[in-house]
Design a protein with these regions (language model features):
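Canonical positions in the second alpha-helix
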Residues: 28-29, 62-63, 96-97, 130-131, ...
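Structural marker of alpha-solenoid helical repeat scaffolds
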Residues: 32, 66, 100, 134-136, ...
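Residue-level recognition of tetratricopeptide repeat
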Residues: 36, 69-70, 103-104, 138-140, ...
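TPR alpha-solenoid repeat register
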Residues: 39, 73, 107, 141-143
C-alpha cells in the first residue's frame, strides 16, 4: 500500500502535539459536548500535563467509546500507556491509530520509538523509514537520528553511514527538533564534535519550556555516543554517556537508551 504525504494533516498533528490545555479549559469543552472525541482527547492531554496519567488513559478510553474511529484518542492513550510502563498496550493503540489514519507519520513514529526502546530495533527502522515517506524534509531530522543510531546499535555501520544520504541537512528544522538537527549535522560532518554542544546558544534556540535544555541534551549526548562508537573511539563514546548521566532526564528517549550502556560501563550501579 502506498501512503501519501498530507501537509494539512501534518499541521493538524503539530497542533495536537504542541497543545497545553488546562484541565479547566478541557472540562469546558466537555460541558459543550461530552460525546465529542476531540474534547476527550483535550481532556486526556490536560490530565497528563498535571501528572495524572491513569486518569488521562481513562479519558482517552471514554473518547474511544464515544467515537471509536477518532484516531488521536488511541494515540493519546498509547502515549500515556508508555508513560506508566504498559508498552505492549501502547504499541497496540499506536497500531490501531495507524490503521485508522495510515498517512499520519506521527503514529508510525511513536510506534517506532516504542518498539525501539523495548528491544525491537530492526522492526523500528522499518517504521521510521515509513515516516520518511509521509513527512516533509524539515521533519526528517528525528527520523534520520533514530535510523542512524539504530544501525549503530545493531553494529551495521555501513547502513548507518548510507542513511545520512536520505536527508538534506541544510533544511531548517522546526524549533522542537533542535537537538535532532544538531545530531544529524554532526553525523554528516557539518558540525565538529567540539562545537556540537553550545549551552548558551541552546538556551536561546530550544522551545521555551522548563527543563527543555536538559531534555535536548539527553538525546544529543546519546547521539554523540553513537557517533564516537561508529568512528571507533570507545573512550570518547563512554565519556558521552557519563556526560549524559549528569543531565539525566528520566523518560527522555536518549536517557532510556543510555541506561543499559551506563550499567555495562559501571557508570550506573546495578
Amino acid at each position: 500500500m502506498k501512503f501519501v504525504y498530507n501537509e494539512e494533516k501534518n499541521e493538524e498533528m503539530r497542533h495536537i502535539l504542541m497543545m497545553q490545555p488546562t484541565v479547566e479549559e478541557a472540562e469546558a469543552l466537555l460541558k459543550k459536548d461530552d460525546t465529542d472525541g476531540y474534547a476527550w482527547y483535550v481532556y486526556g492531554t490536560a490530565l497528563s500535563l498535571v501528572g495524572k496519567n491513569e486518569e488521562a488513559i481513562e479519558a482517552h478510553s471514554h473518547g474511544i467509546a464515544f467515537d471509536p474511529f477518532y484516531a488521536p484518542n488511541y494515540f493519546g492513550r498509547g502515549r500515556r500507556d508508555n508513560a506508566v510502563g504498559r508498552h505492549w498496550q501502547a504499541i497496540a493503540d499506536f497500531t490501531v491509530a495507524i490503521h485508522l489514519d495510515s498517512d499520519n507519520w506521527t503514529y508510525w513514529y511513536y510506534r517506532a520509538t516504542t518498539l525501539n526502546l523495548h528491544g525491537h530495533v530492526e522492526e523500528s527502522i522499518d517504521d521510521f523509514k515509513q515516516c520518511m515517506h509521509l513527512s516533509e524534509a524539515s521533519e526528517h531530522y528525528p527520523l534520520i537520528h533514530w535510523i542512524y543510531t539504530s544501525y549503530v546499535e545493531l553494529g551495521k555501520f555501513d547502513e548507518a553511514r548510507k542513511c545520512l544520504d536520505l536527508i538534506d541537512a541544510t533544511v531548517e528544522a522546526p524549533q522542537m527538533d533542535y537537538g535532532y538537527c544538531r545530531a544529524v549535522r554532526l553525523y554528516k560532518g557539518m558540525i565538529k564534535p567540539e562545537d556540537y554542544i553550545d549551552i548558551p546558544t541552546m538556551k536561546k534556540a530550544v522551545l521555551p519550556r522548563e527543563k527543555r535544555v536538559e531534555l535536548e541534551l539527553n538525546g544529543m549526548y546519546y547521539g554523540l555516543y553513537c557517533y564516537w562508537t561508529l568512528h571507533g573511539e570507545p573512550e570518547k563514546a563512554a565519556q558521552a554517556i557519563r556526560d549524559l548521566q549528569k543531565v539525566a532526564y528520566p523518560g527522555a528517549f536518549g536517557y532510556t537508551k543510555s541506561i543499559p550502556i551506563a550499567k555495562k560501563l559501571g557508570i550506573i550501579k546495578e
